Amino acid sequence: MQIYKVGGAVRDRLLGQPVTDIDWVVVGASTEDMLIKGYRPVGTDFPVFLHPLTNEEYALARTERKSGVGYGGFVFHASPEVTLEQDLIRRDLTINAMAEDKDGNLTDPYNGQKDLQARILRHVSPAFAEDPLRVLRVARFAARYAGYGFTIAPETLGLMRQLSASGELKALTAERSWKEISRALMEEQPQVFIQVLHDCGALKELMPEVEALFGVPQPAAHHPEIDTGVHVLSVLEQSARHKHPLTVRWACLLHDLGKGLTPEAEWPRHIAHEHTGLRLIKAVNERFRVPRDCQELALLVGQYHTHGHRALELKPSTLLELLQSFDVYRRPQRFEEFIAACEMDARGRHGFEQRSYPQADYLRGAAEAARAVSVQPLLEQGLKGKELGDALKNERLKALKTYKTSTV
C-alpha cells in the first residue's frame, strides 16, 4: 500500500499558496485492506474512506470509463492493480494531476509543474471532453488564478467549446452546476468565470439570459463601456474587489437581465427593464435551485436598483414603499446588501470605479429614520389592527419627510 497526496494540495504548495484541503490517493490496496486499518467507508460511487484519526479523505486509485451523458455518466473501477499514473490521467488539468509521497517526492507524469510555471491551464487527456462539468471547473480555475497570470491553453478552450456545443451541459444537475457557479462567484476575479463561459459558448447553454446582454448597447453618457455584457462583468468585478458576499455577487450578475429583452429599435434606452427582467431572474434562480437568500436579493435588486440610484430624488412616500419592500425593520442586513449591489452597479462603469456614491449613506439614513419611529405611543392610544398599521405608516412617512428636508 502506497499513499500519495494529490491534486489541489500539491498544486497550491508549488504555487506558494496556503494548503487548506488535502486529498489522498491509495495505490495497491483493496477495500478490505482499508477496513482492516480502521478507515471508515464514506464513498457511494467509488471507494472513499475517512482516516481513523484525522478524518481526511483517502480514495483508492481508480480508473473511469464514459458510459452515459452528463457528470454522472461514468463507470469507475478501483483495484490494487490501478497505478498512480492511471489515477492521475483521469483528472481534469495537468496542474491538478500531480502527486507527492510522504517524503515530498513529486510524481508528475503529465507535466503539471511545467504548466504551473508557464501559467497555463491545460487538460490532461482527450477524456477531458467526456465530462461537461469540467467546462465550469476550468472557468472557475481561470477566475481563481487570473491574478497569477494563468490562461487557458487554446486546445483546452477548443475542447470546452466542443463540450458546450454538444448539448451535454444540459445534463448537469442543478445542484452540481450551482456548486461550481457559487464557488466561482466567490473567487477573486469572478468576472473571468463568466467571460470564459461566454468565450467557449457555455454561457449561452447555461444562462442564455446573461449571454443575451453581450452586444446590447446602453447610453454612452451613463455607460462609457456601452456593452451591457461588459458592464455586468465590471459590476461583478467591483463586487469581488469590495469583498461582498455571494448574495450581492449573484444579484450583481443578474440585475440587468431585462436589458436583453429591449427591442433593438429602442436601443440604447431600456425603459422599464427593471420589471421586464424579473421573470428572467426568477427563471435563472429556479434553473439552478439557488438558495432563498440569493433568490430574494437578486429579485429585489433587479426590481429596485434604479430606485437606489435615484434615492435623493425619491418622494418620501416612494422611499417608504422601498423600505417596506425590503422589510428593513426586521431584515436590515438585506437592505444593506441592496445598497451594496446598487453601489457596485454604479461603480461598474468604465471611469466611474472610484466615484463616490452618496445614495448609499442617504438610504442608510432613511432606513434609520424609519426604524427610529416607536410604535409604543400608538399602542398607548389604544390603536390596533389596520388602524395601528396605518398610523405607524403615517408616522414613518413624517419621519422620512423630516429626514429628506434636513438632508437633501
Curated annotation (Swiss-Prot):
ATP binds at G8, R11, R91, R137, R140. This is Multifunctional CCA protein. Catalyzes the addition and repair of the essential 3'-terminal CCA sequence in tRNAs without using a nucleic acid template. Adds these three nucleotides in the order of C, C, and A to the tRNA nucleotide-73, using CTP and ATP as substrates and producing inorganic pyrophosphate. tRNA 3'-terminal CCA addition is required both for tRNA processing and repair. Also involved in tRNA surveillance by mediating tandem CCA addition to generate a CCACCA at the 3' terminus of unstable tRNAs. While stable tRNAs receive only 3'-terminal CCA, unstable tRNAs are marked with CCACCA and rapidly degraded. Transmembrane segments: none annotated. Gene3D superfamilies: Beta Polymerase, domain 2, cca-adding enzyme, domain 2. CTP binds at G8, R11, R91, R137, R140. SUPFAM superfamilies: Nucleotidyltransferase (SSF81301), Poly A polymerase C-terminal region-like (SSF81891). The lineage of its organism: Bacteria, Pseudomonadati, Pseudomonadota, Gammaproteobacteria, Pseudomonadales. GO terms for biological process: RNA repair; tRNA 3'-terminal CCA addition. Its EC number is 2.7.7.72, 3.1.3.-, 3.1.4.-. Belongs to the tRNA nucleotidyltransferase/poly(A) polymerase family. Bacterial CCA-adding enzyme type 1 subfamily. Residues 228-329 form the HD domain. Monomer. Can also form homodimers and oligomers. A single active site specifically recognizes both ATP and CTP and is responsible for their addition. Its cofactor is Mg(2+); Ni(2+). Comprises two domains: an N-terminal domain containing the nucleotidyltransferase activity and a C-terminal HD domain associated with both phosphodiesterase and phosphatase activities.
